[in-house]
Regions:
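Intrinsically disordered, low-complexity terminal regions
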Residues: 1-224
Length: 224
């Protein structure tokens, strides 16, 4: 009887942790919504892996190569926790949108020619990358932490959003903050830094040229 009980308990534990794989077809863009945690993993195939317990709380739609991932759980948790998470395996990825408190991250380099990142409403993107060009925008308290290498880039932080790119090696970069945004940035050749209506741009490293423009307040700082 005890052996039977242990077997039943073991099966329940196994089933509760079983993973489900979804073949969503090829995609090069992703959009995440509503406090969901998404790990990006480079792969030879495109797929989404999730826990079976989360399957009923996640909607996945691939429309014209743009994969939308949404948490449909009505009872959302605190800002420091995520009840629903998925792993996204991708072949090529050049655009990431994080919305409504979602969290997107990678532990391995995302390699592409051009990368576009957008985050809003308290969302977070933490990405390691190797690219030629990046466009990154944050709004409404969203944050980004970017690491790796990019030849050129355009970074924009609005309305309390923040971009930490001091560990992303640029040759040339444009950094613009509006209405209380914050950007930490590093480049070897040129930084074009602009502040409007408050906010700060903090410049790391020793770029050869720094072009500063301030309108209606804000700070541009050289960090040694």
């Amino acid at each position: 009887m005890k052996n039977l009980l242990f077997t039943v308990v073991g099966l329940i534990a196994f089933n509760s942790q079983a993973q489900v794989t979804k073949d969503m077809g090829d995609f090069s863009e992703i959009r995440t919504t509503n406090r969901i945690k998404v790990e990006l993993i480079p792969s030879s195939e495109s797929k989404v892996v999730l826990d079976s317990k989360d399957e009923s709380n996640i909607t996945l739609v691939n429309k014209n190569g743009k994969l939308a991932i949404k948490n449909t759980l009505k009872e959302l948790v605190s800002d420091s926790d995520y009840k629903v998470s998925v792993k996204v395996y991708y072949k090529n990825l050049n655009s990431i949108e994080a919305e409504s408190g979602s969290y997107v991250f990678s532990s391995k380099n995302l390699e592409t020619t051009k990368l576009k990142l957008n985050a809003n409403s308290g969302s977070q993107i933490d990405i390691k990358m190797k690219t030629k060009n990046i466009e990154a925008k944050v709004f409404a308290g969203a944050t980004m932490k970017l690491e790796g290498k990019s030849d050129t880039g355009t970074l924009i932080a609005n309305a309390g959003g923040a971009i930490d790119a001091k560990n992303l090696d640029f040759i040339t970069v444009d950094a613009t903050v509006n209405a209380g945004g914050k950007i930490d940035v590093k480049a070897t050749e040129t930084v074009n830094a602009t502040t409007r209506a408050g906010g700060s741009v903090n410049i790391y490293g020793n770029p050869k040229t720094v072009v500063e423009k301030t309108t209606a307040g804000g700070n541009i700082n050289r960090v040694k």
